Amino acid sequence: MSNVIAELGNATKRTDLPDFRSGDTVKVHVKVVEGNRSRVQIFQGVVIRLQGSGVGRSFTVRKVSFGVGVERTFPLHSPIFEQIEVVTRGDVRRAKLYYLRNLRGKKAKIKERREA
């Protein structure tokens, strides 16, 4: 039974995803359906959480829009979004960046990771 579930999970996994982790700034191209039309909306922010494994893996992106913090959680292997672009790599020491919710301005800025 577990082999059937594993095969089904592997069939629905996406292969076009870049490597990213907590602290990275990403652009998520989200498909928005309005009536009979669909369009692509870009949600850019910092990845504050990666959770789960396999097909059930999800990630949360946080941005500040007009002074209000907005967080959105996406299933990683979902057809909800078209693509993910990594804008910058962040240098953080935590896997979950919930402390960013309480920081404002320059204190909420994440140091950029240098690639060697």
Curated annotation (Swiss-Prot):
Q: Which UniProt keywords apply?
A: Ribonucleoprotein, Ribosomal protein
Q: Which domain of life is it from?
A: Bacteria
> What are the protein's GO molecular function terms?
structural constituent of ribosome
Function text: This protein is located at the 30S-50S ribosomal subunit interface and may play a role in the structure and function of the aminoacyl-tRNA binding site.
Task: Give the family per the record.
Answer: Belongs to the bacterial ribosomal protein bL19 family.
The UniProt entry, under HAMAP family, shows: Ribosomal_bL19
Q: What is this protein identified as? A: Large ribosomal subunit protein bL19
Q: Which gene encodes it?
A: rplS
